[in-house]
Every structure is written in C-alpha cells, then in structure tokens.
Amino acid sequence: MNRLFKMVSLLLALCLVLTAVPFAYAEDEVIDADLTCTITLGNWPPDTAADAEKALFEGYKATMAKQYPNVTLVPDYYSYSLSNYVPMAKGHTAPSIFQPPFTDPQLLISQGLVGDVTDALEQFGVLDQFSPSYVEMLADENGRIYGLPRDGYVLGMHINIDLFREAGLMTEDGLPMYPKTLQEMAEYGQIIKEKTGKAGLVFPASETYGGWLFTNIAWNFGCVGENALEYQDEDGRWVCNFTSPECIAAMEFMRDLRWKYDILNADATTTDWAGAHSLLGTGEAAMNFAADDSVDQPTANKGLPVDSFALIPFPAGPEGRYALAGGTCYMFSPDITKDQAVALMAYLKVLGKLPFLDEQIISGMRADYAAKRDRGAPVLPAISAWTDAEYNAAKQAIIDEYCNVDMRLYADFFDSISQGTIALKSEEPIFAQQLYRELTAVVQRMITREGADVVKALRKAEESFQEYLDDEYNDY
C-alpha cells in the first residue's frame, strides 16, 4: 500500500530529483559508433502534424545519426490507448517507445508488457539520482525501472474568449469574466448559451472521459478524505464509496448542467478528448475542462487564435478547490534489447527530456518553442519534471523569449499552483480507469434521462466497482 501513496506524492509534486550528467557532447561528435540496433519511435509526429514539428523531429533523427551512426531510427507514430497497446505488446508489434498516461504504468509493469531500462539509466549515470517516489511509480517491486517522465499537467479550464465577449462576459480591462466556482460556471454557461446559441460547456462523456472529469468535480464537492471515492479500510481492503452525500450532490450537479442550466454540448455521450478541443477551438463551445499540456489542441490544431484563448484554474466547488495533477511518461516495448534500451536513452537525451545542458540541448529547446510559436500554439511557462536549477532557468529564459501570449490570460492558472491557492490531487489510487468507466456510465445516464435516479445509478455503479475491486485485488 505504501507504493500507491508514494505514487500519489510524486504526482502532487509534479517533479522528480535528477542531477545533470557531468559532461556533454557536441552535436556532430560521434559518441558510440559500436552501438548497433534499430528502434521504432512511437512518439514521432503523425503525418498530419505541422511541418515545423515534423522538421524538429527530423533534426533529432539527424543528430542521432551523427552521434550513434549505427543506430537506425524508424518513425512509427502511435496514439496510445490501453486497449490497443496490450495486444500489440503481446503480439510483439509494439513500438520501441510510446507515451502512456501516469495511470497505466503499474498495470503494464505488473503484466510484463513493458521493457526494463534500469541498466541503460545506470550507463547514463542517472540511476541513483531518482527520487524514491519516482522509482515507486515507474518501477517494479524489485526497483527495476520501466519508464521516464515526459511531462506533467494540471487540469484547469480552457476558455473561448470570443464567445465570452459575444455574451457580454468581459471585464473593463478586456479580460474574460471567467468562473471562479462551479456554480458560476453553470450560470455563465447559461448566459453564453442564451446569447450565442453555443454550448456553455463541452463535456466529453464517452468511454472513460466523463468519469475522469467527474472525479475532479466530486473532489470539489467534498469527495476526499473520509468521503473519498475509494479508500482502504482497517483490514487493508479497498472500498469504493459512490453513495456518500457529497458524491450524490456532485452527480446531481452534473445532472443539473444538462437539465436545469442546459449548458452542455448536444452530443456529450459521443464526444471524446479530441472532440472536446475541436468544439472549443471552432467556436461551438465556450468552456472545456482541460490542462496546460493541451493548449495547442484548440489553437494550433483547430485554428483558435491565441489571443482568443485563455487557461484558467479549475473552478472551486462548495467543499473545496482541487485540481487533478497528472502527466505522461515514456515507456518501452517489452521486447527491447540491452542495446535498444541504451539507444532509447540516447534518443531521449537528444530530445532534451533528460536534464543535460549543452549547446545542442539549448538549441533543441529553442527549436521546440519556436515551432510552437510558429504553428500558433501558446508558448507558456513549463511545469517542470526536473528540479535542476540551471536546467529549469535555461528553459524558462527560452520560454520568455518565444512567449506569444498575453500572460494575463494565463496568470491566475499558474499563480494558483505556485501560490498554493488550489490543492493539487492525483488520480484515484487504484484501478482508476475502471472507476472512470463506471462513473462515465452514470454521467451518461444523468445527461440523457431527465428523470434519472441519481442514488440508484450511483449505487449500481458502486456495487459493480466493488465487485471489480474484490475480484482484482481484495480477494486475489
């Protein structure tokens, strides 16, 4: 059980402790001509990506060709989901590197579906510098490591300023009059719907997305501590709790968003993460629960100008102000060899994902943020995965150089994190995806049936998820 709570501590901190390798190489210097292998890159941009992004990765590939001339890199874009990855891993067709969310590593590790990179990390001189929490999250029970952090995120809310302006919800300073609370969100969304005809809030309620977002709403209604959605009893058994007064109130609020305030997008039950960003970016919705790591989706990808976009803190509820903190990691095929593991660590170093500082890495950072700016994505302060002061200062200086937004549209979001005015909370500690699936079904029922019984639906989901907990953990 200590493993789960140590995993939580890392996500809340959104950082890990690593020190920089004490030397670096010139970009065109051969580092290891003997290393010979092929690696497939699941983190390669898709064919539909902007030319600048594809050029950036071609540059990384060229650098690897100079430093490791006998390592072959094969672009192999892959959009991860647990359901499609498992058969790939079992069928020996998984890419060498891929990018799952922080919810999945322990499951993948326990099932033997990912590759061990411990020895490669030791070869790069960083193995002993990992924080205990990091090891607990991406390691097995023997301390063998299977992944590296890519980035972290904090859930907030994306705003389409054009719709706020059309609805008359602007301050004298020309800033959106954004909602500070969930109640204000409902009321402002109603005004927007009435005055513009567009959805006040896009809520993706397909697959597991609805339950995922609902948990953050539930926390802000008080589903934490002794009222948590899941907890361990005195015997160490995991118990789910969907029928507390707090959870019932949160789900009633969810129902009201559809039937009382009528602010949701019409096709919520079939809307996914990408669809939600599309609706906001194309002006079909004014608000979307989303994080700082996806600000490029409605802007660069869907055409919303950066001066028509804002990122705000997750609205507070009647019993708290929490925001989900999570992230994405790099993990590796279970079939990788020792040489492939070393090549993959070298590749991540070239990408600037390890805290090395040299001219090549700084040049890569510049190219990364320049590409974001050039394709119309907001260039924002980073929530760093590293605590190395020199590395973070260099990165922030480059961000400042390429910043292309009015930071007043983002300041409250970042200030709420740095000043601690919002409490960061990681995802539910055990079988989160199954929990989301059960709660998504309840959300779907609430927003499609006006007279749906909240307590009955939550009790049914509670019984189903408890049976799952018993089968998969308590009685195992």
Question: What are these language model-derived features?
Answer:
Residues A186-I191, Y231-A268, F314:
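Glycine-centered hinge/linker elements that transmit conformational signals in sensory
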